[in-house]
Each structure stands twice: as structure tokens, then as C-alpha cells.
């Protein structure tokens, strides 16, 4: 395949914000963690938002988290979105804290060492969202430790997740641009297969579990059986 022009690569990358630890672009979200805390003052004014990684910072109570947010907002551009990141095993605490602090996005990290599968994380997140985030002010997200496919994105969005961030499978910016375009095409193919025109039209009813184990932990309708397994009605 012929190489993309630098401008075309730039345009693709600019349409996709990244979560970064350093050197943020104007569209990027700067992660705030123990590793880069000393360099936040230089980097944050350039970023399009910031994410507080609760899993990689010392424990904080509500007042301490408020204090950190005030300090970070004083360094950031006006009215940038704020994200909280926490382990999926603590998703209820994450959502409760996000609601209390009026956070824009509550993002759960899937690979947190707890052993919870993606399939079991979906109903857990859905129940917590319904309990703690029913005002609609805070969006929910997943932070994946692997490169998501178009199919992965379709499943997550159909499950009610608003934002997905995942690891890029390569470091070169041009390769990342190609990968983003390919993932977008994969997602478009998934939408056509389901018969919807927009990712916003995807719903849980479009999902099917292809095996008994996935149906058991996710509550999805089992393909062929066309309803959730009986224990989900107990």
C-alpha cells in the first residue's frame, strides 16, 4: 500500500484523542499518576483534559481528591473534561466518587489483576451505572490493555459504555493512523451486519453470547436459545 501523506496521517490522528503520560497534543487527555506527578505542571496546559489514575496514586479521601482536582484545574485550560480511572473490581466506588465530584467520565481499567473477564465486567458496570450515575452527567468508559477491534468496540458500545480507550498495537504514528482507519472500517462492517446506521443505535438487544460460559457471566441472550439463562431471572 502507498504511504499516506503527512497531512492525511495528521488528520486521522487529530480525530482520535489519546490518553498519554507525557507530551499531550491539544486533543489528548493527560494521565495523572505517581510516575509523572512531578512533570504535570509543564505538560497539563497543553492537554485537552486530564485523567486522575486512582489506581496509581496514594489513597485519597473526598477532600484530598477535591484538593488535587482544584490544583490540576488551575494548571489546565478552562473547562477541560475530567476523568477518573479506577480498577474494574472497584467500579461501584469509582461511579459513586465520580457522581459525588461531578466528574465528566468514569473509566474502569479492565486488566486490573482481579481476574474479572470482560464479559462479567459488562453487567457489573451496567448495574453500578444504574445505581450511581442515573443523572446522566457522568459518562462511563473502559480502559483496555489490548488493541480493540471493531467487533470489541461494537460489543462495548451496545452494552452501554460511552467511551473506550485501548492500547495501540504499534508505536509509529503512521502505523497507528493505518490501524485507526482499519478499526473504523471494521466497526462500520459490524454496524452493517447488525443492520444499524450509527454506533449510537447499538443496544444490548443486538448482542448474543456464543457460548454457555459467556451467557452465564454476562446475562446476554444465548445464541439459539434467544433469551438470558434462567439464573438471571432469579
Spell out what each predicted region is.
Residues 59, 91, 112, 131-134, ...:
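An almost-null, non-specific background feature
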Amino acid at each position: 500500500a502507498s504511504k499516506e501523506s503527512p497531512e492525511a496521517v495528521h488528520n486521522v490522528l487529530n480525530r482520535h484523542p489519546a490518553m498519554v503520560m507525557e507530551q499531550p497534543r491539544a486533543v489528548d487527555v493527560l494521565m495523572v499518576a505517581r510516575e509523572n506527578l512531578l512533570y504535570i505542571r509543564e505538560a497539563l496546559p497543553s492537554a485537552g483534559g486530564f485523567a486522575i489514575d486512582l489506581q496509581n496514586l496514594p489513597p485519597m479521601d473526598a477532600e484530598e481528591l477535591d484538593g488535587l482536582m482544584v490544583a490540576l484545574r488551575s494548571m489546565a485550560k478552562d473547562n477541560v473534561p475530567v476523568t477518573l480511572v479506577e480498577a474494574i473490581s472497584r467500579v461501584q466506588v469509582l461511579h459513586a466518587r465520580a457522581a459525588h465530584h461531578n466528574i465528566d467520565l468514569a473509566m474502569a481499567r479492565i486488566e486490573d489483576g482481579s481476574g474479572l473477564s470482560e464479559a462479567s465486567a459488562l453487567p457489573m458496570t451496567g448495574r453500578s451505572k444504574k445505581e450511581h450515575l442515573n443523572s446522566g452527567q457522568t459518562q462511563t468508559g473502559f480502559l483496555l490493555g489490548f488493541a480493540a477491534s471493531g467487533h470489541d468496540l461494537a460489543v462495548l458500545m451496545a452494552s452501554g459504555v460511552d467511551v473506550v480507550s485501548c492500547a495501540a498495537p504499534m508505536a509509529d504514528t503512521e502505523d497507528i493512523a493505518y490501524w485507526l482507519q482499519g478499526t473504523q472500517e471494521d466497526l462500520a462492517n459490524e454496524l452493517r451486519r447488525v443492520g444499524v446506521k450509527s454506533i449510537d443505535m447499538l443496544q444490548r438487544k443486538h448482542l448474543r453470547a456464543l457460548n454457555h460460559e459467556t451467557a452465564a457471566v454476562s446475562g446476554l441472550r444465548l445464541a439459539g436459545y434467544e433469551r438470558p439463562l434462567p439464573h438471571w431471572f432469579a
